Amino acid sequence: EEVGQAWIASFFHMVIVVSGMRYKRWILPFLLFAAALVMSMQVLAVPQALPLANRAYVIDSGHGGKDDGAQHGDVREDAINLAIAREVRTLLIEQGASVIMTRDGDHDLAGEDVENRKREDMQQRVAIINCGWADAFISIHLNAYTSANVHGAQVFYQEENAASKQMAQQIQQQLSASTDTKMSAKPGDYYILEKPSVPGVLVECGFLSHAAEREQLQSESYQKTLAKAIVDGVIAYERYEQ
């Protein structure tokens, strides 16, 4: 009986965070349905006074596994993305939201034998976002540029989606208040923004190519600052949408 209970707990943990294995296409919808069912039951226990009660989000931590993303020496984007994404998840849950992570470990979402890993990885991320459970998504990334002087967090959105634009502007406003970024929210031509069926944003949390910002991005305290700004922006967006 204990083994059975442990298996069930492990299964639902795997479903909720959507990590730890490579999904075949036919099983992903089933896993997402199970996750949505569990999350819907959890929502009943959330205090309704919390600002994000009854709201559900997908947090997409960019890159992972064989795809490190941007790099500077031994500093890897994918690891920092995941650290920030986990902080965002924690804060969203504290505010009453339900959360699914596209990944919660050092892996991508492509199968082992897939030739075009990047395409498969992105398709799986979008499939998770489009599961029918989420109200919105947030994709976490870091930037890099040929000039070492460029720095600052910046939020991107799909140009024709008014809700995504509003979310991006609210998050950018909070990032500007919490960090020294001078960037503005702007439209972005990214697969992760074009294909989902719900509003969402891509947050470039800073530049690994900028020495001072690179040091900040590796700091747990700065990661928490970024996460809080993102979640404060989400709360402001939800209030605006009401």
What are these regions (language model features)?
Residues E2-Q242:
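Catalytic-site microenvironment of enzymes
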